[in-house]
């Protein structure tokens, strides 16, 4: 434990908070360009083909982002909006693509949780 004199000289050092989404540089979302769209397998015990994309953000950083929902229209050179949010069973995937924004279409025939997937309200 420091003495009072040591505290007068140096003071206490603030703890540095570590961000979970460093590539966003403090922004809620960032725009980026898809450099590669592919599928990958989750870690044990899950089994699937998860849709992900390599995205070069306008901050200059390249990240791996998850494409949520059923089906998508993304390909190389698509402009996407990326938000934070990890995918627990995909190591290294700490970002998600926002559905219904920029070049990304919303999920078709979505009835519940529509705002998360950029789906418009159906008529009738």
UniProtKB/Swiss-Prot annotation:
Q: Which Pfam families match?
A: Ribosom_S12_S23
Q: List the disulfide bonds.
A: none
Q: Name one GO molecular function term.
A: tRNA binding
Q: Which residues form a coiled coil?
A: none
Single biological process term from Gene Ontology: translation
Oligomer and partners:
Part of the 30S ribosomal subunit. Contacts proteins S8 and S17. May interact with IF1 in the 30S initiation complex.
- This chain belongs to the protein called Small ribosomal subunit protein uS12
Q: Which organism is it from?
A: Frankia alni (strain DSM 45986 / CECT 9034 / ACN14a)
């Amino acid at each position: 434990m420091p003495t009072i004199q040591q505290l007068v000289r140096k003071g206490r050092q603030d703890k540095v908070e570590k961000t979970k989404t460093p590539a966003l540089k403090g922004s809620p979302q960032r725009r980026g360009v898809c450099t590669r769209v592919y599928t990958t397998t989750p870690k044990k015990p899950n089994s699937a083909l998860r849709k992900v994309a390599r995205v070069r953000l306008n901050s200059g950083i390249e990240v791996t982002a998850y494409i949520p929902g059923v089906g998508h229209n993304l390909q190389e050179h698509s402009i996407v909006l990326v938000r934070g949010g990890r995918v627990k069973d995909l190591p290294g995937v700490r970002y998600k693509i926002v559905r219904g924004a920029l070049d990304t279409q919303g999920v078709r025939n979505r009835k519940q949780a529509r705002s998360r997937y950029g789906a418009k309200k159906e008529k009738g």
